[in-house]
Amino acid sequence: MENKSNSQILFAEAQQYIPGGVNSPVRAFKSVGQEFPRFIKFAKGAYLYDVDWNKYIDYIGSWGPMILGHCDDDVLEAIQCQVKNGLSYGAPCKQEVDLAKKIIELMPNIEQVRFVNSGTEATMSAIRLARAYTCRNKIIKFEGCYHGHADEFLVAAGSGALSLGQPNSPGVPEDVVKDTLVASFNDMESIQALFEKYKDEIACIIIEPIAGNMNMIFPQDDFLAKLRAICDQNSSLLIFDEVMTGFRVALGGAQSIYNVKPDLTTLGKVIGGGMPVGAFGGRKEIMQKVSPAGPVYQAGTLSGNPIAMTAGIKTLEKISQPGFFDELGAKAQKLVDGLNEAAKAYDFNFHAKCLGGMFGLFFCSDKIAVNTFVDLGKTNLKMFNQFFAYMLDNGVYLAPSAYEAGFISIAHSDEDIEKTIYLAKKFFQEN
């Protein structure tokens, strides 16, 4: 009789009570061909420990929030102090004001901000606000960019970029997504064609300025600046979804790196320090349309709760210290350089890239440009699955999808990075 791990046993039990056994699909490890996910018992610093007491170097960081590493002492202390004063009030608190001020200080394109409970809520609310502000209904998103699971975002491109979006999940009515237009990332021709066809109907463009749900694809040839220009020419708004990149690739987010000003920005992940949180903000004249200042409705029972606000305040205080992002970026660069050198040593078709505390792994030659969702689909996805399994078996926890970016924290040591490179080198040698 096969001896099953505690993770296997828990997964079987979970499937009896939770659809698919998980509360977010990617966690099931199905996309990488694994029979079961690892159930985590606890985490500290750069490490995860599963229910079978296996230790992993964690390069997911709860999908981005844990920029300080798990259970940072200062964040924990701040949360513990607040817990004694209450978990949630359903009323305004000083922590909301303090976190809002800190975000606005660090991201100058945000003049006012509204807190919500998730990235999905943030993007959904930003779209509603853009539609109300412009009195238009159509939005443009990009194939491969993920903005949460609101109905208007769950679309796939039809036959060519000029197609109206088609639902890619059952339960999403075609009428809901008929106003969602899908373009190709890094392709201005597809954007120009949409504006030519729907010139006075487009409320906004929403984009991940660095596409972290296509592994990690950077904007090319001033793509973001060109989007800013075409939005200005057509009185449409530009929304940067920085739920992933905000306070992760740089202190001022991707918009500070590319020096492009969005009208609205969505945030999440890092601003909650590991607690559930989201936010959307931007120009004051637009944000003043949000209720109760204006007519655009948005509300939430736990929005701005003092626990999440406290965790966010302490996290932003720490990452805004001089030299933090230099150190974080150096760690990511050390990892990426080591992986690229290892692949080159064995003539293995692989390359990696990074920015700030975020990195991407591509199973193709560095001579092959990966600038779109279609490009990524042409890489060796099966080889990624093999790499994932090998690294997991040897104590390295990577994102369980070739379409997801990875994250490094300030808690990762040189030894952690060197072990990761060593294991990758062995894989490249053997494959």
Swiss-Prot record:
Signal peptide: none annotated. GO terms for cellular component: cytoplasm. SUPFAM superfamilies: PLP-dependent transferases (SSF53383). It catalyses: (S)-4-amino-5-oxopentanoate = 5-aminolevulinate. The modification N6-(pyridoxal phosphate)lysine is found at residue 269. Keywords: Cytoplasm, Isomerase, Porphyrin biosynthesis, Pyridoxal phosphate. Transmembrane segments: none annotated. It is found in: Cytoplasm. GO terms for molecular function: glutamate-1-semialdehyde 2,1-aminomutase activity; pyridoxal phosphate binding; transaminase activity. GO terms for biological process: protoporphyrinogen IX biosynthetic process. The keyword Isomerase applies. PANTHER family: GLUTAMATE-1-SEMIALDEHYDE 2,1-AMINOMUTASE, GLUTAMATE-1-SEMIALDEHYDE 2,1-AMINOMUTASE 1, CHLOROPLASTIC-RELATED. Belongs to the class-III pyridoxal-phosphate-dependent aminotransferase family. HemL subfamily. Homodimer. This is Glutamate-1-semialdehyde 2,1-aminomutase. It comes from Francisella tularensis subsp. tularensis (strain SCHU S4 / Schu 4). The lineage of its organism: Bacteria, Pseudomonadati, Pseudomonadota, Gammaproteobacteria, Thiotrichales.
